[in-house]
A protein has these predicted regions:
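Intrinsically disordered, low-complexity segments enriched in polar/charged residues with Gly/Pro
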Residues: 6-7, 32, 81-84, 119-123
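Structured segments of extracytoplasmic/periplasmic soluble domains
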Residues: 41-49, 57-61, 138
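Sec-dependent bacterial lipoprotein signal peptides
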Residues: 1-23
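Short solvent-exposed beta->alpha transition segments
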Residues: 36, 51-105, 111-112
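Exposed beta-sheet edge and beta->alpha loop/turn motif
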Residues: 97-158
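Short, low-complexity N-terminal intrinsically disordered segments enriched in polar/charged residues
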Residues: 20-48
Length: 158
């Protein structure tokens, strides 16, 4: 009797584990690995000012913001970028999914980057700052959804 109860318990546990694996524990759409890789790629390109390369990681509605950022790069900014010894680096801190399952916010830390200032002002070198990147599903993939240029509350070191 004990063997059949134990066997039944193991069978139920195995069935539950199988169903859990098949249904997954995701409460959101899309692929987590794709999301993280694309957040990293977008942020690395964006904060190193490779704006055309960021387009594939953004929603279509984000393109005007990227064009705006690119149009505000001045000669002095380019010289400062070239003078930097190291590229900007990115660390993903957290990704929070919206209740709708098709929106998310990525919290990132960016180090050693030039941050654009107001129009007509040179960019400022920043040691470290945190940013929140809104995301949404577009064409069955996670994309950065820019509603403005990424901004942080941290001050520059210049």
């Amino acid at each position: 009797m004990k063997k059949s109860i134990l066997g039944m318990g193991i069978a139920v546990a195995a069935l539950a584990a199988s169903l859990y694996g098949l249904t997954g524990c995701q409460s959101h759409e899309g692929d987590d690995n794709q999301l993280e890789a694309d957040v990293d790629s977008f942020a690395t390109y964006y904060f190193n000012w490779h704006f055309p390369k960021t387009l594939k990681y953004c929603t279509r509605s984000s393109e005007p913001w990227l064009r705006y950022a690119a149009s505000n790069v001045h000669k002095a900014d380019v010289e400062r970028l070239r003078a930097k010894e190291e590229d900007a680096t990115v660390e993903i801190n957290d990704i929070t999914f919206g209740n709708d399952g098709v929106t998310a916010t990525a919290s990132i830390t960016v180090r050693n980057f030039l941050q654009m200032d107001s129009i007509g002002q040179e960019a400022h070198l920043v040691d470290e700052a945190e940013f929140l990147l809104p995301m949404s599903m577009e064409d069955n993939a996670w994309k950065i959804r820019m509603v403005n240029l990424p901004r942080s509350g941290k001050r520059s070191r210049d």
